[in-house]
Amino acid sequence: MSSLRLDLAYATVESAISTMEDPIRQAHDLLHNRTGAGSEFTGWLQLPKTYDRAEFARIIDAADRIRASSDVLLVIGIGGSYLGARAAIDMLSHSFHNQLPRSRRPGCAVLFAGHNISSAYLSDLFDILDGKDVSVNVISKSGTTTEPAIAFRLIRRWMEKKYSPDEVRRRIFATTDRAKGALKRLADEQGYETFVVPDDVGGRFSVLTTVGLLPIAAAGIDITALLAGARDAMAEYANPSLATNACYRYAAARNLLYRQGKQVELFVAYEPSLQHLAEWWKQLYGESEGKEGKGIFPASVLFSTDLHSMGQYIQEGQRMLMETVVRFDKPRRELTIPPAEDDSDGLNFLAGKTVDFVNQKAFAGTLLAHVDGQVPNMIISVPEQNAYHLGQLFYFFEKACGVSGYLLGVNPFDQPGVESYKRNMFALLGKPGFEKEKAALEARLPR
């Protein structure tokens, strides 16, 4: 199949890309020789080729059983433990897949929990689950991450009231550490089927592991094609030469733009089904690069919707923005605009044109307007909205992220900053061992 295409003609740095050849090669060597910071978490690099075939077969089998026995798969996880799966399911499924009758979708409905601490959301979720057959995939390497742990406590009790002990065992699947952790212990005690979160793959890079693959497969998506796309991308982006490696050209371009003061990168999509791909991308780049006082701030917009809210700022606000546009050569579905007898909206000049034709012209017009407004654009064109090309896209962004982090001079595979809010939250909640911090924090809060 054809590959993704990167167009830097509107990025304003294309002529300077060759100056990044040596830094790119150095970053490539750090990544591939596993000599860079965080190298113990680079298992994702070869994963599309070296993945565990036996576990993959178990994923397919479990997904078949979930689809056969359940109206709903409830996925419990946060961050990298759910964003990749949600991105894939939203991008590759019917826009209203959960609302379709079962006979018109290839998998069960997929709902999510454990990605917030909202009592209203969880209560509303139980309303939706009432009267339905449910399977659960709880995803947590440790089993102690606050949001999914709270959600799983509640969901587990609900499942135990609804089903017999044997049925609960058959319906709960735990994706967790191979040998240790609270969730692994609980799963072994209760007899839940378990899948492994690899030790050498961090959460935000884990979409092509069991973390992402089981929910994606349960939704009826072809995970063999997803991995095939990633595997072909792995081969295509193995050469460090900027002349042939689009993934590295993207990493080089965004770093050049950052050095020119473009501190905010907007992920731009013209399909609403890419909303959670944008969320996945934001975590990938934000957690990987935002440290040591450095990093491009990742944000996202959905056009044309956000042209009616953020368009003014992008066009004429602070000149700190760059855009990465993900677009498709071919829409997943198409409609033709009909003529209207009265032409009261003045749009008969579009009669006979497709809706996607209008969307593509919106893209072209916006591209030129933003470039004229000094917002550089990097364009990634994807041949089709399918599993194979999403696999390519996942790998493209993951590898570009690793290299980009090394170009920036940071460890792209850790996230030390996230511990600060957790310590404060645990102290304020009264977790044992945090008594001194609790008193100090409460003294700073409004009374």
Curated annotation (Swiss-Prot):
GO terms for biological process: gluconeogenesis; glucose 6-phosphate metabolic process; glycolytic process. The active site is at E287, H308, K422. Its EC number is 5.3.1.9. It is an enzyme of class 5 (isomerase). One of its GO terms (molecular function) is monosaccharide binding. It catalyses: alpha-D-glucose 6-phosphate = beta-D-fructose 6-phosphate. GO terms for cellular component: cytosol. It holds the Pfam family PGI. Gene3D superfamilies: Glucose-6-phosphate isomerase like protein, domain 1. Pathway: Carbohydrate biosynthesis; gluconeogenesis; Carbohydrate degradation; glycolysis; D-glyceraldehyde 3-phosphate and glycerone phosphate from D-glucose: step 2/4. Keywords: Cytoplasm, Gluconeogenesis, Glycolysis, Isomerase. It is found in: Cytoplasm. It comes from the Bacteria. Catalyzes the reversible isomerization of glucose-6-phosphate to fructose-6-phosphate. Belongs to the GPI family. This is Glucose-6-phosphate isomerase. It comes from Heliobacterium modesticaldum (strain ATCC 51547 / Ice1). The lineage of its organism: Bacteria, Bacillati, Bacillota, Clostridia, Eubacteriales.
